[in-house]
Every structure is written in structure tokens, then in C-alpha cells.
């Protein structure tokens, strides 16, 4: 019983020691509170309108007929497209696009209206700057749709001239009517799409960095032996006492972004907020386990921080947010499972978007549990480094 009390006393002593370190170094306040708050507000306000609107495009109208002017007016009527300039030729439009004045331009050659009326298949062209992926993709969609509508309008006029009724003409032009219903994010809101992963991703990256830093700086400042003595020589009490205050702060920041996204901004959360809070707690603990593995594998502050930053940044690409994992190379599909953010993203898709029961995500919860167990692999090596390693600047 006395031995058990000694363990609790040692744990409390390590926690008090760590709390003193947290309040004495502004770096902890910045990385654990200020930086996450800034990122939450920055990303959500950056994309507060959901989709970009009124993106500037140009027009090269060499036809100069009522038909071409109607085509330009219809293009300008799209929510995401704004016709801001007209150019005499393609060269001027290309130069404007290279300067960044417009994201694309629509080219209507001379004789387009006459060829359309004579059913000689006139050709229109459009060019988009796909260096900017979102702007280029959205404008490409609008310009392509405008071209298809113009083609349909010309064909409909020809059918009317041949005596077809409106019902007959529409049945010929569109024999199958498509009724589209996007699921889970029907507004196609980029903020919903990105912020639900950016917020936990940034938090995960900061947990990596702070976990590695808080242990590595003990080695750098040669206070590691004092830290171990405070825990009566137990590496597990040392780690628990050091990281429990971190866990509490980071989980509070996780509760904050969940409340902000699902309570204040009303992002889709079809299974309720409690499963997402559990997933957030699992992500925090898994990230801390991963951080211990990083500093245990490379017990040097600069190498450990490099490992943490590299792994954290790669997580945004490998989690399947920007590019679907199922479309990756099979080797990369396997490697994606080595990133905690990947499993959090899948839990988010199942719980918040689809509203499935938690049992459907059990494999991802188990994966996060495995990340929590990673310190068992490096505990002995880390203890030896704390006792014997000499920091070389």
C-alpha cells in the first residue's frame, strides 16, 4: 500500500514539476493554446463563403453577334464566374492570364452563329489556369457547362425549325434527366470539406512537436536525471506525469474546435458530438504516443523535431483528404495507415458525415489504440538516453 502511495506521490510531483515548466516558458502557451486558436479561426474565416464566387475570366468574342453576346451574358450569370474583360485576340487574353488578372478566358471564333444556324458544328474554346487547382477546376466546369448549353440551344432551334414541339425537342436533346443529390455536404462547401480535417491535423502536428520538445529539452538542458529522480526512477511515471497536463490542455483545445465547428458553425455532425469528442481524445493520446516514439527513436532534440514536423506535414497528404487513398499506389495505401490523422479522418467520415454507429469504425479506433501503445517499443531506449546521452549542440 505504501509503495502504491509512493507511486501516486511521485506522479503528482512530476505533474507539478511539469506545470511549473509549462507556465514558465511562453513557447508552451503559444504552441498549445495560441497557435491552435489562430489556425481554427484562420481556416474557417478563410473559407467562410464555402465556395469561391465571382472568379474573374475574360472573353475573346470574334463573332460579335447577338448569339455570342447572349453566350457571354449566360456565362457571366454563373455564380462562380465573373466576366471582367474582353480581349481582341487570344494573345492578349493569354498575357492577362499569365499576369494573374484572370483565371481563364472563353474564345468564340468568327462565324460561330452562322455555322450554328447552318448546323456545321462551330467550335468554341476555353482555357483555364490549372496552376490554381480550385479556381481552374470550378471555371472549367462552368465553361464546359456553358458550351454544352449553347450546343443544346442551337440543336433545339434547329429542331423547332423542323416542326418539333418543345417536348419532342427536349426528349431528343436530353433523353435521360439526371437528378443529382450530393450526400452529407449538399452545399459542396469547401469549409466543411477542409476544416474538419485541418483543425485536428494542426492540433496533431503541434502535439507531435510539443511531445518531442518537452522530452528532448530535458536531454538538451541536462535535467533528464532530475526528472527521473522525481519519479523514483520510473520511466512510465515520468512520461505519465509529464504528458498528462499536456493531454488535458490539448483535449480542451479539441473540445473547443468540435464545439466551434459543430455547435457554432453548424457543420454536419449526424451522429452527435460525443463520438467526435471520443475520436478527438483518441487522436490526442495517439499523437502523444507517436511523439514518444519519435524522440525515443531519435533522442536528439533537433532530429526528433525534424521527424515530428516531417511526419505531421505528410499526414495532410496521406490521410486521404486532398487525394483519395484508394486512388493511391498500393504501397502508399498501406503507408497511409501509419498516420493517426488517416484514422481520425475515416472516423469523422463515418460518424459526423454518414452518421453510422461507432461499431462501423472499430478498426480505426483500434489503430489509434495501437499508436497509444507505441511508447512500449522505445521506453527502455528512452530511459537509457535520459540517463547516459550527452547532448551535442
Q: What positions do the PLM features span?
A:
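Extracytoplasmic/periplasmic domains immediately adjacent to an N-terminal transmembrane anchor
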Residues: 1-190, 385, 392-393
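Hydrophobic alpha-helical transmembrane segments of multi-pass membrane transport proteins
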Residues: 38-41, 181-261
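Hydrophobic alpha-helical segments typical of transmembrane helices
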Residues: 67-71, 211, 223, 347
Amino acid at each position: 500500500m505504501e509503495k502504491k502511495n509512493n507511486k501516486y506521490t511521485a506522479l503528482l510531483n512530476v505533474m507539478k514539476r511539469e506545470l511549473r515548466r509549462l507556465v514558465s516558458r511562453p513557447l508552451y502557451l503559444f504552441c498549445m493554446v495560441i497557435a491552435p486558436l489562430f489556425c481554427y479561426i484562420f481556416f474557417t474565416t478563410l473559407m467562410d463563403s464555402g465556395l469561391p464566387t465571382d472568379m474573374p475570366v475574360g472573353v475573346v468574342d470574334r463573332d460579335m453577334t447577338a448569339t455570342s453576346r447572349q453566350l457571354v451574358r449566360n456565362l457571366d450569370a454563373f455564380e462562380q464566374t465573373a466576366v471582367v474583360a474582353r480581349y481582341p485576340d487570344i494573345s492578349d487574353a493569354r498575357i492577362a492570364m499569365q499576369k494573374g488578372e484572370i483565371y481563364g478566358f472563353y474564345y468564340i471564333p468568327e462565324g460561330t452563329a452562322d455555322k450554328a444556324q447552318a448546323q456545321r458544328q462551330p467550335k468554341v474554346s476555353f482555357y483555364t489556369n490549372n496552376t490554381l487547382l480550385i479556381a481552374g477546376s470550378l471555371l472549367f466546369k462552368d465553361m464546359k457547362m456553358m458550351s454544352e448549353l449553347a450546343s443544346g440551344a442551337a440543336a433545339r432551334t434547329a429542331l423547332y425549325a423542323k416542326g418539333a414541339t418543345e417536348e419532342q425537342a427536349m426528349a431528343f436533346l436530353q433523353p435521360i434527366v439526371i437528378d443529382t443529390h450530393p450526400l452529407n455536404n449538399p452545399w459542396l462547401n469547401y469549409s466543411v470539406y477542409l476544416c474538419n480535417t485541418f483543425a485536428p491535423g494542426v492540433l496533431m502536428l503541434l502535439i507531435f512537436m510539443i511531445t518531442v520538445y518537452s522530452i528532448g529539452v530535458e536531454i538538451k538542458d541536462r535535467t533528464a536525471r532530475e526528472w527521473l529522480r522525481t519519479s523514483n526512477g520510473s520511466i512510465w511515471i515520468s512520461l505519465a506525469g509529464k504528458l498528462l497536463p499536456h493531454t488535458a490542455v490539448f483535449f480542451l483545445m479539441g473540445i473547443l474546435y468540435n464545439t466551434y465547428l459543430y455547435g457554432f458553425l453548424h457543420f454536419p455532425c449526424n451522429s452527435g458530438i460525443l463520438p467526435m469528442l471520443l475520436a478527438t481524445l483518441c487522436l490526442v493520446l495517439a499523437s502523444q504516443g507517436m511523439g514518444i516514439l519519435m524522440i525515443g527513436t531519435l533522442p536528439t532534440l533537433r532530429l526528433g523535431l525534424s521527424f515530428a514536423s516531417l511526419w505531421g506535414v505528410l499526414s495532410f497528404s496521406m490521410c486521404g483528404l486532398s487525394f483519395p487513398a484508394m486512388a493511391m499506389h498500393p504501397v502508399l495505401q498501406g503507408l497511409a495507415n501509419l498516420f493517426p490523422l488517416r484514422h481520425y479522418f475515416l472516423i469523422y467520415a463515418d460518424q459526423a458525415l454518414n452518421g453510422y454507429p461507432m461499431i462501423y469504425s472499430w478498426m480505426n479506433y483500434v489503430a489509434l489504440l495501437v499508436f497509444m501503445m507505441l511508447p512500449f517499443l522505445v521506453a527502455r531506449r528512452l530511459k537509457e538516453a535520459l540517463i547516459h546521452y550527452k547532448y551535442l549542440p
